[in-house]
């Protein structure tokens, strides 16, 4: 189990993080950065995260993040596509969340509709959680504008764009 401000940084065209358990996440548990390859693939397989004050997975690179068989509890967001990066990759990001259970989490995924981001949910178990928060991202470092939520309710499978 890990405790610190930021935990794991994956730099480049992809990585696999398997069966890692984070507790008391302060800033981000996993940060993905350093790639402009739209075909980059990042995998989070198994594991869990608890007590994240903000987000668990921060996606600053291009590409797609695949989160599967994961448990998250007591956190702000499971996943956030960068909504105000003023350097590095600026463009479409995607996340596919499968077989995930969320408890006491504000939002499963935060995406930027103006960048073409999407979040796909399959067999996700949650209650009292917003599945997808949609934002208008920017490239100037300012806080992005929240547009609203989608995929809420008891639906365990949907796509948010």
Predicted regions and their residues:
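Extracellular beta-rich repeat passengers
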Residues: 1-2, 9-161
């Amino acid at each position: 189990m890990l405790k610190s401000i930021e935990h794991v940084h994956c730099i480049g065209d992809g990585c696999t993080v398997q069966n890692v358990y984070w507790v008391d996440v302060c800033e981000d548990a996993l940060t993905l950065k350093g790639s402009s390859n739209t075909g980059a693939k990042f995998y989070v397989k198994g594991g869990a995260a608890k007590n994240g004050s903000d987000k668990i997975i921060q996606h600053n690179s291009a590409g797609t993040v695949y989160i599967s068989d994961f448990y998250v509890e007591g956190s702000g967001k499971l996943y956030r596509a960068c909504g105000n990066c003023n350097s590095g990759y600026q463009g479409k990001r995607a996340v596919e969340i499968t077989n995930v259970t969320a408890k006491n989490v504000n939002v499963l995924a935060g995406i930027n509709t103006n960048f073409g981001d999407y979040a796909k949910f399959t067999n996700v178990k949650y209650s009292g959680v917003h599945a997808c928060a949609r934002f208008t991202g920017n490239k100037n470092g300012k806080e992005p504008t929240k547009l609203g939520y989608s995929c809420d309710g008891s639906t365990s499978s949907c796509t948010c764009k």
